[in-house]
Each structure stands twice: as C-alpha cells, then as structure tokens.
Amino acid sequence: MSETLGILKALADDTRLKILRALSERDMYVELLAERLQLSAATVSFHMKKLQAAGLVDSRREQ
C-alpha cells in the first residue's frame, strides 16, 4: 500500500508528469530536460529524485 501511495504522490505533480512524458520519448540528461521543459537543472534534479524514490525512473551517470 505504501509503495502505491508513493507512486501516486510522485504522479500528482505536473512537473513530474512532464518529465515522465519527455523521458518516454527518449533518454535525456538533466540539462537537456531542463532546457526542453524551461526549468532550472536544480528543479529537474529535485523532481527526478522524487521519481527515482517512487521507482518510476532510473538514472545513470555518463562517463
């Protein structure tokens, strides 16, 4: 039940929905998402952490 609640809370935010929509088209790094959504990289990072905590996205560092 708490896992479902976490997912629903993550999906309740418009910005996070926009991020998920953009990522459904292709993988993107934070800076590109920020540019595309006209947000700061810090804002995108904040929301990505929430999406990761809910298990909705994975992240990786490019080398």
Please place each PLM-identified region on the residue numbering.
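Alpha-helical DNA-recognition elements
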Residues: 50
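N-terminal helix-turn-helix DNA-binding core of bacterial DNA-binding proteins
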Residues: 2-43, 54-56, 61-63
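Residues within the DNA-recognition helix of helix-turn-helix
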Residues: 47
